[in-house]
């Protein structure tokens, strides 16, 4: 009869000798062999081994009975699956297990008489495979984690009762308690944390608090970690206490930055305007400009007018150069008026305001002119008019004279200095003055006006015949406008 629950294809013959004589050798001849060896196995040499004592056999029998009862060596992992390799020791293995026939008859079935076949087969557990017949591998109930019971926690309660003044076990004490109670180290730490929390709620604290930072909130940490957490919380509290002063310092820094931004914006706005040298006959000893508040009002007004004139000259100089190039390189187009300044061309942004050239040219009130246009009007008019004309007559001169005075004031006479248009305008002005003098002397209004018109036509015709390759500037009509953009 074989026992498939062990996985060994052995017969019911006993495997251990029951003799108490330790000196009697066990001699065997070529007897039975295992089925794996085959029927034609050669005869084996006898092997001598000491006989086991009864106390060793009793212990082994007890362990085999417990292992069979647990069913951990069931049939699914029998000999065909390779489990029998643990008891196979090469080609001479049958010599160890083949017994004498007489001893087999005398003690038949005595070794496994108390073993009953297993009712069910359990799966193979790998964690116990390395312990074949070891008592620690077969007994797995006490080594596994289980819930804490009253029997296990009684030891912890006794330790807590003895250490009411300091219920914080060290790491070594926790390990010792875990071994005694068969609990894990985490379970022991959690139990003590819960016990301390429960005592605090019941107002049964008999120990001083640890800086208001106990391990109830962190039941899985050790004392060293708790102390580190306490130090970190203290550092955080000190940082929070220092936060208001830090905020005030940041606000002060921001206010300083705002002041710097305001100063930079003011300086950038001031840089948009071109600086003008301050004409002062007596500078200060320190080298700085004198204060403007000390100047008289009239001097301040004159200085502002001069600055405006300088700005106007700086704005109109490039436009004058373009106009001169256009007049010298263009072809004659009859009596069409050519605009010297394109309407869409923008001037510099530093110009204080925009003037209308048509309004300035046709205006008879020189008080409306800007200061830059009135600077050289008197001198240029005296140079242009050859005949002696009084101041009252100059205000009532022809439009050519007004336009010439305005052009001289703006362009400083760079354009009409060496051109035929300059001569034509001068002749026209002289003829206009002569005609007006004849009107005043004779009183014949109609004939004088006719003679004046004929003279003007003749002068214009002579101008066209003299230089037909250059343009002349015609007078704008009543509805036309000239722009300086």
Swiss-Prot record:
Renumbered to this chain, the signal peptide range is none
Which stretches are labeled DNA-binding?
142-203
Q: In which tissues is it expressed?
A: Ventricles of the heart, developing feather buds, retina, hindbrain.
Stored InterPro entries: HD, Homeobox_CS, Homeodomain-like_sf, Iroquois_homeo, KN_HD
Give the record's keywords alphabetically.
Activator, Developmental protein, DNA-binding, Homeobox, Nucleus, Repressor, Transcription, Transcription regulation
Q: Where is the composition biased (Pro residues)?
A: 282-294
Segments passing through the bilayer: none
The Gene Ontology biological process annotation of the record reads: cell development; heart development; neuron differentiation; regulation of transcription by RNA polymerase II
Q: Does the keyword Zinc apply?
A: no
Xref: Gene3D superfamilies: Homeodomain-like (1.10.10.60)
Where does it sit, as one GO cellular component term? nucleus
Where is the protein localized?
Nucleus
Query: What Pfam families does the entry give?
Result: Homeobox_KN (PF05920)
Report the family membership.
Belongs to the TALE/IRO homeobox family.
Q: What does this protein do?
A: Regulates the chamber-specific expression of myosin isoforms by activating the expression of the ventricle myosin heavy chain-1 (Vmhc1) and suppressing the expression of the atrial myosin heavy chain-1 (Amhc1) in the ventricles. May play a critical role in establishing chamber-specific gene expression in the developing heart.
Q: What is this protein called?
A: Iroquois-class homeodomain protein IRX-4
Q: Which gene encodes it?
A: IRX4
């Amino acid at each position: 009869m074989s026992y498939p629950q062990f996985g060994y294809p052995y017969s019911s013959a006993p495997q251990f000798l029951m003799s108490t004589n330790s000196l009697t050798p066990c001699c065997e001849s070529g007897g039975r062999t295992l089925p794996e060896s085959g029927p034609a196995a050669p005869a084996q040499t006898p092997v001598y081994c000491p006989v086991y004592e009864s106390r060793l056999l009793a212990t082994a029998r007890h362990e085999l009975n417990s292992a069979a009862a647990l069913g951990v060596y069931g049939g699914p992992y029998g000999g065909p699956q390779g489990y029998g390799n643990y008891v196979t020791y090469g080609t001479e293995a049958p010599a160890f297990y083949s017994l004498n026939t007489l001893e087999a008859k005398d003690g038949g079935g005595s070794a496994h008489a108390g073993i009953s076949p297993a009712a069910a087969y359990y799966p193979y557990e790998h964690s116990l495979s390395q312990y074949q017949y070891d008592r620690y591998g077969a007994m797995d109930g006490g080594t596994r984690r289980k819930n804490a019971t009253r029997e296990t926690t009684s030891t912890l309660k006794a330790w807590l009762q003895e250490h009411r003044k300091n219920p914080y076990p060290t790491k070594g004490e926790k390990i010792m308690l875990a071994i005694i109670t068969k609990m894990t180290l985490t379970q022991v730490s959690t139990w003590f944390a819960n016990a301390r929390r429960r005592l605090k709620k019941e107002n049964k604290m008999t120990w001083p608090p640890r800086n208001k930072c106990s391990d109830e909130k962190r039941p899985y940490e050790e004392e060293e970690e708790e102390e580190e957490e306490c130090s970190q919380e203290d550092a955080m509290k000190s940082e929070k206490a220092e936060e208001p002063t830090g905020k005030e310092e940041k606000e002060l820094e921001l206010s300083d930055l705002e002041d710097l931004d305001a100063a930079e914006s003011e300086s950038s706005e001031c840089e948009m305007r071109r600086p003008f040298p301050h004409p002062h006959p007596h500078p200060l000893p320190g080298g700085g400009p004198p204060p403007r508040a000390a100047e008289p009002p009239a001097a301040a007004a004159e200085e502002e007018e001069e600055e405006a004139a300088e700005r106007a000259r700086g704005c109109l100089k490039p436009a004058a150069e373009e106009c001169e190039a256009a007049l010298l390189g263009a072809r004659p187009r009859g009596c069409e008026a050519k605009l010297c300044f394109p309407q869409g061309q923008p001037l510099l942004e530093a110009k204080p305001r925009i003037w209308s050239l048509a309004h300035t040219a046709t205006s008879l009130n020189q008080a409306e002119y800007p200061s830059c246009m009135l600077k050289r009007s008197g001198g240029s008019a005296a140079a242009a008019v050859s005949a002696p004309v009084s101041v009252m007559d100059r205000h009532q001169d022809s439009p050519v004279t007004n336009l010439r005075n305005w052009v001289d004031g703006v362009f400083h006479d760079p354009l009409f200095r060496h051109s035929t248009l300059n001569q034509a305008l001068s002749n026209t002005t002289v003829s206009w003055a002569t005609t007006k003098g004849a009107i005043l002397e004779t009183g014949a209004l109609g004939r004088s006006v006719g003679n004046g018109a004929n003279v003007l036509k003749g002068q214009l015709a002579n101008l066209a015949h003299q230089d037909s390759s250059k343009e002349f500037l015609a007078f704008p009509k009543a509805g036309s406008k000239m722009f300086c953009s």
